[in-house]
Amino acid sequence: MRKPVTPPGNPPRPRSPGYGSTSLAPGITAANSNTRISPPTLARPAPAAGAGGQGGNLGLNSDRLRHAMVQRLRTQGIVDERVLNAMAAVPRHLFVDEALASRAYEDAALPIGHSQTISQPWVVARMIAAACEDRNPTRVLEVGAGCGYQAAVLAQFVREVHAIERIRGLFELARGHLRALRLATRVRLIHGDGMLGLPGVAPFDAIVVAAAGLAIPQALLDQLAPGGRLIAPEGASNQRLVLIERTGTASWKRTELEAVRFVPLRAGIQS
């Protein structure tokens, strides 16, 4: 079992990307957690490049801010250059409300509407890097697309990305963002139940799950390709990231990683 990893320079704390609940655990706030909270405003689809407004103005120096974010990720232990380059390429400020664009490159979760958040950059980088370490995945499934940011990062180096979002409003939001960045043909976005996966598209070289179940759904394990990896939070009050690799037709290798705090994985869809 690997020892839990905490990003250098950050005190140990729960982390909680995911979707469903709006409650915050003790000590977790919108600034230090990915727990999705009730937002003050609703996020809007990304404006086209060069558009006005605060998000468009931030674009003038967003390259510098993204570079600083990537340098911070390096100090926090992210070493996969594919992931770092992808994070540097995707304009995170276009995935949040214009009123929050100035905070887009902080290592913080930010509200995107529908009582949900965009996951903090370190969590996105950590999960993608773990799922793709020492391999070149060509088909990846994301469960819990949110505003589309993580799918956009994956699409920078993965040929075929499939992303499922159970909340209709977020599905529409993510679709608008991906279209604005001309990534709609690189990411197949589905409004559906992520716990079921996409059996008609499987197998997947990697699966990234953005909410915690008491156990990893067997349907998702079955949809991993041989040698494929799934990363997800698991547990109720005491949660950990788990990395699962398929080693045979009916065998999987499990490795526990960091202690985390995610909201529950939920079945079904929300219109």
Curated annotation (Swiss-Prot):
Q: Where is this region: Disordered?
A: 1-60
Broadest EC class assigned to this enzyme: transferase
* Entry keywords, A to Z: Cytoplasm, Methyltransferase, S-adenosyl-L-methionine, Transferase
Q: What EC designation does it have?
A: 2.1.1.77
- Which superkingdom, per the lineage? Bacteria
Compartment annotation: Cytoplasm
For this UniProt entry, what is the primary localization, expressed as one broad class?
cytoplasm
GO cellular component term, pick one: cytoplasm
| CDD domains the UniProt entry points to | AdoMet_MTases
Task: State the PROSITE patterns in the record.
Answer: PCMT (PS01279)
What does UniProt list as catalytic? 119
Reactions the enzyme catalyzes:
[protein]-L-isoaspartate + S-adenosyl-L-methionine = [protein]-L-isoaspartate alpha-methyl ester + S-adenosyl-L-homocysteine
Which portions of the chain have biased composition (kind: Pro residues)?
A: 1-15
Q: What does this protein do?
A: Catalyzes the methyl esterification of L-isoaspartyl residues in peptides and proteins that result from spontaneous decomposition of normal L-aspartyl and L-asparaginyl residues. It plays a role in the repair and/or degradation of damaged proteins.
Task: Please report which protein family the annotation says this sequence is part of.
Answer: Belongs to the methyltransferase superfamily. L-isoaspartyl/D-aspartyl protein methyltransferase family.
Q: What is this protein called?
A: Protein-L-isoaspartate O-methyltransferase
Q: Which organism is it from?
A: Bordetella petrii (strain ATCC BAA-461 / DSM 12804 / CCUG 43448)
Gene designation: pcm
